[in-house]
Structure formats: C-alpha cells, structure tokens
Amino acid sequence: VPDGKVNVAFLKQLKTFITRRAAKGDRFVIICGGGGTCRIYNEGLRRVIKPTKSELDWLGIYTTHLNAQFVRLVFGKLAHPTIVGDHAAFEVKRWKTSVVVGGGHKPGGSTDTNTILFAKKLGAKDVVNISNVDFLYTKDPRKFKDAKKITHISWKEYRGMMGDTWTPGMHVPFDPVASRLAQAAKMRVALLGSDVKNLSNFFAGKVYKGSMIE
C-alpha cells in the first residue's frame, strides 16, 4: 500500500503471474508485511502514549494480518481459506492450495523473520523479498545522490551494514533477526522491486534487476 493507495496494477500482474505458475504445479507462500500502514499506526500510538516495544510489535502484527487477508482475497480459490502466522502450527501435509498467505506471529522481529521460519520448515533455500525498492544501496537513495547499487552481498557484509538490533517499525531491506536466521540456515534472499516481469525473469533463471544476499 504505497503512499496510502493500493497498488492495483501490481496486484493484478502478480495474480496473473502466480496463476500461470500454479497451473504448472508451482506453489507459493506469501508472507505480508505491515508496510506504511504499520508505521503510521506505530507513530500515532507513540504520539498518544509511551508504548512498549512489545505493544508496538503487536500493533504491527495486526496490520500484517489486515494486509494478508486482503492478499488472500485477491487470490480467491487459489489461496488457502485462512491466513497463517505460526510456522510451527502450519501442517505442510494439509496444504492443498497453490497459495498460502500469512502475516506476523509474535513480537521480536518483522514478517521477514516469519518468512525465514516458514522457508526453513518447507526446506526452501531461496526467498524473494518484494518491495518498492529495486536494489539494496550503500545509502538511502532518496536522501543521498551518491548512493550506489549493490547487486550482490554476503550476509556478513549485509549484517555489518544493518546491525543486529530489531526496533519495531524499523525500515530496512531485510530485518536483523531474519538476517541472522537466514545466514545460519545458508539461505539466499533476493531483494526485488515490484516489477512482475522482473520477478518472472528471476523465476525463469534469466537476468533480473535486484540484489542477492547470501
């Protein structure tokens, strides 16, 4: 939901892409973040009271559930009828649909962390992170004109840039807790933008625009 507006064009293209891949037998777990909605609520709460980190995290988790319900409805019958949150309670053998949509589960990290936990349970080694930023940069490109794209980086280097401390609502390409788990599990995370054609290229093993962390 960039700038408070639903990206309808992106959702239509994503649904078409996943529907086509599903027809070939591919299956998807989509974990939704809280995005700008989460940050708006967190900031609003901070201006009224002094919330604990746990309270801010729970508020963020519920915004991810709203986003997940929305995405689940977008995919209709392709999607599992309920959203998921707890990776430990997710029964892989009972997963019959092409798509499962989920959100956050518990405080202490973003949905990036939950994504890695689901990937570990499913035995996946590659995770795709879709956002409104096409690449990882050396600095925030919105603030610094000399920011440079990073197309490939190790987990050690990435964690050195981002640190290891999680703060509720923090805006980073991939959260510190999830990064630590992904590194330990020897996973790769592809940071891609919202260009579905680019996403298709990645899945097809073609040249794509984005950053790979491994």
Residue ranges and their predicted role:
Residues V1-E214:
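C-terminal catalytic "cap/lid" subdomain
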